[in-house]
Each structure stands twice: as C-alpha cells, then as structure tokens.
Amino acid sequence: MAKFKIKTGDLVQVITGKNKGEQGKVLRVITETSRVVVEGVNVVTKHKRANAQGEAGGLVKSEAPIHISNVMLGDPETGKPTRVGYRTETVERDGKQKTVRVRVSKSTGKDL
C-alpha cells in the first residue's frame, strides 16, 4: 500500500484534467486505487432506481474519485498549490522524547 502526502480534510487544487483550477476539501483517500474524492470536484450524475422501502428514484449528484497525481495540496497561507516536504521535530509526551514528522509547504516553509 502506497503512502500519500495528501490526507482527508486537506485543501487541494486540481492541476490537470477537466476540473483544472478547482479547489476543494478531500473527503476520502482511496489508497488501493491511488484516488481521492474532493468536495465539489468531478461531480457526476447517476440514475437511482426507487426501491421497495419507499425511497424515491431519480437523479443523484455525487463526487467521483480522481487520481491523486491530478491534485496538489494547497498552501494555507497563499491558497496556491505547493509541494510537500517533511521536517522532524522532537516532542516531549508523558516525560518521553518522541520524534514526530511534520508536513511542511515547500513554497513558504509553513506547517500544513
């Protein structure tokens, strides 16, 4: 299973494809297929059939997943897409020293 720099809840921008330039929050990361579901991006219309429990059928709009290589993490300071780096910090928890990796914006150097 691959490790991704984009996590659920991140603000991302689509950098290629039919939704290029659109921004949204990551709702879900699908690691098996290397895809992400972004709020308000790549919206598709599906036909839903009415079922026996009384739910009405009709057209349902939902976000379809897009490949993770087509999105870039947005810098919280500038709002522009940025590359992601890591910095290690030592943090003291319960009297013990722990090393923690922190995601950092390559363009501004700020924590993400």
Curated annotation (Swiss-Prot):
Transmembrane residue ranges: none
GO molecular function: rRNA binding; structural constituent of ribosome
UniProt xrefs under CDD domains: KOW_RPL26
GO cellular component, one term: ribosome
UniProt region (Disordered), positions on chain: 92-112
Record bears the keyword rRNA-binding: yes
UniProt KW Ribosomal protein keyword: yes
Function: One of two assembly initiator proteins, it binds directly to the 5'-end of the 23S rRNA, where it nucleates assembly of the 50S subunit.
NCBIfam families: rplX_bact (TIGR01079)
Subunit architecture: Part of the 50S ribosomal subunit.
Protein name: Large ribosomal subunit protein uL24
